[in-house]
Amino acid sequence: MKKIIAMLLVLVMSVTGLAGCGSSKGNEAGSTSAGSDSDWAYIQDKGKLTVGITLFAPMNYYNEKNKLVGFDTEMAEAVTKKLGIDVEFTEINWDSKEVELSSKNIDCIWNGMCITEERKQNMSISDPYLYNTQAMVMKKSREKEIMKSVKGLTVTAEQGSTGEGKIDGSIADDDTVKVSAQDYFKDANYVASDSMAKALMEVKSGTADVALVDSVCALGMVGEGTDYSDLVINMDNNFGQQEYGIAFRKGSDVTEKVNEAIKELYEDGTVDTIAKKYGLQEMLIK
């Protein structure tokens, strides 16, 4: 079922224009101008790339052995190995990611981040690497009821996320959107969650009726054999298409270094191998 949903997602995106996702809050990420020290030289000097993340499968999460794994985790490890530096992962509050980047607490945001025009103005963004859209997640036993009407129900999304931006109207819709999330949920009660994983937990516990999360997150965390086997993914409503990218400080010369490294990892088959491991091969942007 998940594979079918993923294939349908890619099919829709291949024939439509892609729009940005996610709201950008906080200060502009500090720039690296031609007259200042190279960001790459700064990272080489300290010997590591500090990556800002939040925890959600299949991008960055801890497995049963308490080891940090995931598609973005393994890609960052492969890229930094090719660049000859170490990698360090740091958990951040998603709503303050730009501040963490500009203050140099982290060197990049590599965590299923949607590309938007606003973010491209404030940060240096890598080439897109994965397709994404928004998915409604709810209890299986209540799917028919909820899809009939969300009036008076509680909907949740990660604070600062695409889902929240779609619900509050701060994220513009593209031509593929038939009904905006803002209109769809106008008669529902909105409550923000600290992360997409916590949004799913709210639905599982019954505190919320619906979670609006990235489809990549939903496909990786919901269904048989997961902690959310009693939940179901519904993408009947198209709230727009997005692409994931990696964010660096504005003007950073590290962006192109990473783009080139990823290109080489595509050529030697590493990207396909990692994507297959996490069931994301159908969503790769090649």
Predicted regions mapped to residue ranges:
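Short helices/loops that flank or line small-molecule/ion binding pockets
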Residues: 82, 90-91, 95-109, 122-124, ...
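Flexible hinge/capping segments at coil-to-helix
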Residues: 138-159, 174
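Extracytoplasmic small-molecule ligand-binding "clamshell" domains
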Residues: 29-112, 268, 277
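Hydrophobic/proline-rich hinge and linker segments of small-molecule sensing/allosteric domains
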Residues: 50-54, 125-146, 247-250
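Bacterial lipoprotein signal-peptidase II cleavage site
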Residues: 17-32
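A ligand-binding cleft/hinge motif common to bilobed small-molecule-binding domains
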Residues: 113-121, 167-170, 201-240
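Ligand-binding cleft/hinge of the Venus flytrap
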Residues: 76-85, 163-192, 222-227
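Periplasmic-binding protein-like
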Residues: 131-138, 215, 219-263, 279-286
